């Protein structure tokens, strides 16, 4: 799981630090330290992945000129030398240095986007300079961010202290009349704001990436978790600790010792109450697997046996419910771990959903039509869509939801709604997860707002309590986790207040951070902004307004009047008619989509639609692609839908794409529209959550806009789903249904007007808890039938376990009765499996790919070839490092097709990657023209060197993978224990070898055929694991030295002890085998000599 580490320090001259030295170290660069007239060189330091030096938008001209035309490290060098020169005091504070852990769950590109977002909103927005670097250490990606402590003035730097400005815009004065000052940057309050801002942005980007994770930056104490916080050990402390371990001594560091004490205390607390681990996990994730439990335990538990014991104890905890059993991914054959949640989490969300439904059915908080009309007159520029949304939230229900994209007019709508509520006598307040969002709600909509955490704290202290005259607006509701959302819904229920949730459709994904908002919005319905403008016909826009207001019957009447509703007697006939019309209307220049509510309908419609295109020759049979739901065939021209977020490809759940190139388990598709149109390359081994996209579920279509839509109505639809399905189109919509089934249920209008779809129940389980668990699973995108089956299987397993307990109890009772002489217990003998003499190594510190990746960097041939490549870069480009980064070498390594395209681009347009060395034209000097000539001559050579490097890298990778897999297979072999008879023979053989009586040794070994076979099997295992003659050398006389260290590499302490004990036995075995080989060779040689003597010689 991601680590919540965010620390700050001040780079102070008084503590012997220099901001230029710090910058050079972080940028892994060579810099001139002008104050001391010396050069600092950290170019040998590794781990730098990305670097940026960024100025605020209103930065003065002098600082822009200072860093102009410099590299990132060059800009950093120039700026911080300027700071060093400006600060005159011997104890001057030069900069603030932030160290921030990045989440492993996000890719490097996603982490860079996260940091840029944070820097823009919380550093540059305050006028600070941001100098940051991304260090990609294995398992510990992090950034170092240095910021200024003084504002930038027109000529240089401003004062570190600034006057405190009051609400009237004037400086605040003390009682004596003096102006009150505060630090411009670097104070504790400033740090707290930055820390809160970081965790808010972090959780936002985790949610956008589809990561089921929420990071809480508060201390364990404030979170209510009974654990001691561990201490962050810096680079120096960790280096000392490693060196001490290499020498076999304990590191004498106070921080290390204190950290170990806290880890031991936490281990004790977890042993006493393993449920603490569940508290930790469920604060970050609502659905988890065994790996999540292991990640938490690894922080505190080192002993393997204790670790395994606690793993079992936690997973079998009565509070844990298994939602999905361990399965195999059909498309890849990979193991998918079992998924779990806690009963408390499921009950919490179920209670929240019930309370939200209850609030939606309670009336009495509405605004009169008169007040609404007065508001609309004052805001004449409100769109019909915004008016419909205002009517929705100002309705009588005590809960409402609004979904709209950023910039869609939500704030304008909320401002007008606030005025309407205030006219009706209500008090309107607001809240948001982030302080920035709360501030925006207050400034732009005029709604008194705080952060959600601030509201919770004030209510806890009995201040600013809600009442039946309060309207509470929650902005960015999609980012609020289930537990916090449940608390606010419960508060609204108890206080008699009304709560309005405002969110973004991009946050309506089945992830923890947005699951609460989605769960509520799905149940109570919502108004959607940026919907009505989709439709081009006026009557369609009016119908969409009716749908938004819940007047489904009026909307259906409009579509029926314009011959857009087709009813057939049976549903199957309606499907046939839909496909026929779709085939007739299909136009590759238009976007067309079929919508249905049920997944089985979607699958059927996709198959039928594609068959029509194949018949017409518009797409071919296609190439096989193993998707997560089974095999599909894709060809150029196919329409597809992506079913899972993937940040590295820029894909969103429900996004529509069109295939342009198809091959087995690989496609190239276009996504987006207009200027946003782009191509993505999808490899099955990396991403397989896609399907044909001619038809998709209504839920997947949320937020989508297409030209034409065909809707298959089913009895499972309700008012909210109908609203979504019938507002996705621009040009045309056609609805199809089976008249017979709908007539049995009151007709089309009645079914499609229902406030809530009928809940799914299972014939084999009617308990309330199971229904809640299924709803919980469905909200998070888990397959409901799979979850249901898992719960039933687990119920059966529980019954069988109880039976086993009863059987065990009966046996114990029988044993007790036998002890009293009541009956005689039959005697049984069990055979215990013999432990191996030396156990094989079954677990490894890293995966094969990790080990291969590490070794690639040390391969001599690759290093030499890369030196050639880097030298060519220096010949060709004016700034080789920047050009190298622009080439996107990671993509070049990952995909051969991408590599081919990049290298072709390099050869054809080298200037598109970076400025070439030298210059041309009449103003260029002779050396500059010569440098340009050399650069152009070296472009083809650079391409050849890169191609050679890629070929060599692929060859070396395959060799290293084979070597590592062979090594792992070899060291995993168990050396079997010898039977008592074999041990006796072994001792006799050993004595004979010591007496140098090898014939006697062989005689002892051959004395018993079964024993000889056992010893041969033992020798075979030793040979396969350690090598044929490894233990025959003089270096193998004793289990010590380099040979012993080599053979025991990767072993646990107990395995090393086993090896020491087995060493003389294995050495004796190899000596015996060696002597047998010698005797056999001599025998063969003698037989050959005799044969040669007996061969007759023919005389001529």
From Swiss-Prot:
Keywords: ATP-binding, Conjugation, Nucleotide-binding, Plasmid. The keyword Methyltransferase does not apply. Signal peptide: none annotated. ATP binds at residues 404-411. InterPro entries: (+)RNA_virus_helicase_core_dom (IPR027351), Bep_BID (IPR041533), Coronavir_polyprotein_1ab (IPR050534), MobA_MobL (IPR005053), P-loop_NTPase (IPR027417), TraA_Ti (IPR014136). GO terms for molecular function: ATP binding; DNA helicase activity. CDD domains: DEXSc_RecD-like (cd17933), SF1_C_RecD (cd18809). Gene3D superfamilies: 2.30.30.940, 3.30.930.30, P-loop containing nucleotide triphosphate hydrolases. The keyword Nucleotide-binding applies. Pfam families: AAA_30, Bep_C_terminal, MobA_MobL, Viral_helicase1. Belongs to the MobA/MobL family. This is Conjugal transfer protein TraA. The lineage of its organism: Bacteria, Pseudomonadati, Pseudomonadota, Alphaproteobacteria, Hyphomicrobiales.
């Amino acid at each position: 799981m991601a680590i919540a580490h965010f620390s700050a320090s001040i780079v102070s001259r008084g503590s012997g630090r220099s901001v230029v030295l710090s910058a050079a170290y972080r940028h892994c660069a060579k810099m001139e330290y002008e104050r001391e007239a010396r050069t600092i060189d950290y170019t040998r330091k590794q781990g730098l992945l990305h670097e940026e030096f960024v100025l605020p938008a209103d930065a003065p001209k002098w600082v822009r000129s200072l860093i102009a035309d410099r590299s990132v490290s060059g800009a950093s060098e120039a700026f911080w030398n300027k700071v060093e020169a400006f600060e005159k005091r011997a104890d001057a504070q030069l900069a603030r240095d932030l160290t921030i852990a990045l989440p492993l769950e996000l890719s490097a590109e996603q982490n860079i986007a996260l940091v840029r977002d944070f820097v823009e909103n919380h550093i540059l927005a305050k006028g600070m300079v941001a100098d940051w670097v991304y260090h990609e250490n294995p398992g510990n990606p992090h950034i170092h961010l240095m910021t200024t402590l003084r504002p930038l003035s027109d000529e240089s730097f401003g004062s570190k202290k600034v006057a405190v400005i009051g609400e009237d815009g004037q400086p605040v004065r003390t009682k004596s009349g003096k102006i009150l000052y505060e630090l411009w940057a670097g104070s504790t309050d400033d740090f707290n704001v930055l820390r809160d801002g970081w965790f808010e942005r972090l959780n936002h980007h985790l949610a956008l990436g589809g990561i089921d994770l929420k990071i809480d930056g508060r201390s364990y104490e404030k979170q209510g978790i009974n654990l001691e916080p561990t201490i962050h050990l810096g680079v120096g402390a960790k280096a000392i600790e490693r060196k001490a371990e290499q020498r076999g001594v304990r590191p004498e560091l106070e921080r290390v010792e204190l950290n170990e004490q806290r880890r031991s205390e936490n281990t004790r607390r977890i042993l006493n109450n393993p449920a603490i681990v569940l508290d930790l996990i469920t604060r970050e994730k609502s659905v988890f697997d065994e790996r999540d439990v292991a990640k938490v335990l690894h922080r505190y538990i080192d002993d393997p046996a204790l670790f395994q014991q606690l793993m079992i104890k936690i997973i079998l905890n009565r509070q844990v419910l298994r939602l999905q059993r361990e399965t195999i991914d059909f498309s890849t054959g990979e193991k998918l771990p079992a998924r779990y949640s806690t009963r408390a989490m499921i009950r919490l969300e179920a209670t929240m959903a019930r309370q939200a439904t209850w609030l939606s059915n309670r009336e009495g908080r509405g605004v009169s039509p008169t007040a609404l009309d007065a508001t609309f007159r004052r805001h004449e520029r409100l769109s019909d869509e915004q008016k419909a949304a205002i009517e929705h939230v100002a309705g009588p229900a005590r809960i409402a939801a609004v979904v709209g994209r950023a910039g869609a007019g939500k704030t304008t709508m909320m401002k007008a709604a606030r005025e309407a509520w205030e006219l009706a006598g209500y008090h309107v307040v607001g809240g948001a997860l982030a302080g920035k969002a709360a501030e925006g709600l207050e400034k732009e909509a005029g709604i008194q707002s705080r952060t959600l955490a601030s509201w919770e704290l004030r209510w806890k202290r009995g201040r600013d309590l809600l009442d039946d005259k309060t309207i509470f607006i929650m902005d960015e509701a999609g980012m609020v986790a289930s537990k916090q959302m449940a608390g606010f819904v419960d508060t609204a229920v108890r206080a008699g207040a009304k709560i309005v949730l405002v969110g973004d459709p991009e946050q309506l994904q089945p992830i923890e951070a947005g699951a609460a908002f989605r769960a509520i919005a799905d149940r109570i319905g919502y108004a959607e902004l940026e919907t009505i403008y989709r439709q081009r016909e006026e009557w369609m826009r009016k119908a969409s307004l009716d749908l938004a207001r819940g007047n489904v019957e009026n909307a259906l009447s409009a579509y029926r009047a314009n011959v857009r509703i087709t009813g057939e007697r049976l549903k199957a006939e309606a499907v046939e008619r839909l496909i026929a019309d779709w085939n007739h209307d299909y136009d590759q220049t238009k976007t067309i989509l079929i919508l249905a509510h049920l997944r089985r309908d979607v699958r059927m419609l996709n198959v039928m639609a594609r068959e029509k295109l194949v018949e017409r020759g518009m797409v071919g049979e296609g190439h096989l692609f193993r998707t997560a739901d089974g095999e599909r065939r894709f060809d150029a021209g196919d329409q597809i839908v992506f079913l899972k977020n993937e940040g590295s490809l820029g894909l969103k759940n429900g996004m529509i794409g069109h295939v342009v190139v198809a091959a087995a388990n690989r496609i190239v598709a276009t996504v987006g529209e207009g200027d946003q149109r782009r191509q993505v390359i999808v490899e099955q081994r990396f991403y397989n959550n896609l399907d044909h996209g001619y038809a998709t579920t209504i839920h997947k279509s949320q937020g989508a806009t297409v030209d034409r839509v065909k809707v298959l109505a089913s009895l499972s639809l309700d008012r909210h789903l109908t609203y979504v399905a019938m507002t996705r189109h621009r040009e045309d919509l056609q609805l199809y249904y089976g008249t017979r089934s709908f007539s049995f249920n009151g007709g089309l209008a009645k079914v499609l007007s229902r406030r809530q779809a009928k809940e799914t129940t299972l014939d084999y389980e009617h308990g309330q808890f199971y229904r809640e668990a299924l709803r919980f699973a469905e909200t998070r995108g888990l397959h409901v039938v799979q979850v249901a089956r898992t719960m039933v299987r687990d119920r059966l397993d529980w019954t069988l376990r109880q039976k086993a307990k009863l059987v065990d109890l009966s046996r114990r009772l029988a044993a007790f009765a036998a002890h009293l002489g009541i009956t005689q217990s039959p005697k049984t003998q069990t055979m215990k499996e013999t432990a191996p003499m030396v156990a094989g190594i079954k677990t490894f510190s890293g995966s094969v790919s990790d080990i291969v990746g590490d070794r690639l960097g040390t391969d001599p041939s690759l290093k030499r070839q890369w030196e050639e490549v880097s030298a060519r870069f220096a010949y060709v480009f004016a700034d080789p490092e920047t050009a190298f980064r622009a080439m996107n070498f990671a993509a070049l390594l990952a995909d051969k097709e991408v590599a081919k395209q990049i290298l072709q681009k390099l050869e054809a347009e080298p200037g598109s990657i970076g400025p070439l060395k030298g210059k041309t034209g009449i103003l260029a000097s002779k050396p500059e023209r010569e440098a340009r000539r050399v650069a152009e001559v070296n472009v083809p050579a650079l391409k050849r060197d890169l191609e050679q490097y890629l070929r060599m890298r692929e060859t070396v990778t395959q060799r290293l993978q084979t070597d590592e897999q062979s090594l792992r297979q070899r060291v995993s072999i168990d050396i079997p224990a010898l039977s008592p008879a074999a041990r006796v023979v072994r001792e006799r053989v050993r004595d004979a070898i010591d007496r140098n009586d090898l014939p006697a040794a062989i005689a002892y070994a051959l004395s018993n055929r079964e024993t000889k076979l056992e010893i041969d099997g033992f020798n075979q295992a030793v040979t396969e694991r350690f090598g044929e003659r490894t233990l025959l050398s003089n270096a193998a006389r004793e289990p010590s030295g380099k040979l012993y260290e080599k053979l025991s590499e990767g072993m646990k302490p107990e395995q090393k002890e086993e090896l020491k004990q087995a060493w003389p036995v294995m050495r004796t075995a190899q000596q015996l085998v060696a002597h047998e080989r010698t005797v056999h060779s001599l025998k063969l040689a003698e037989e050959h000599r005799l044969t040669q003597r007996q061969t007759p010689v023919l005389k001529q």
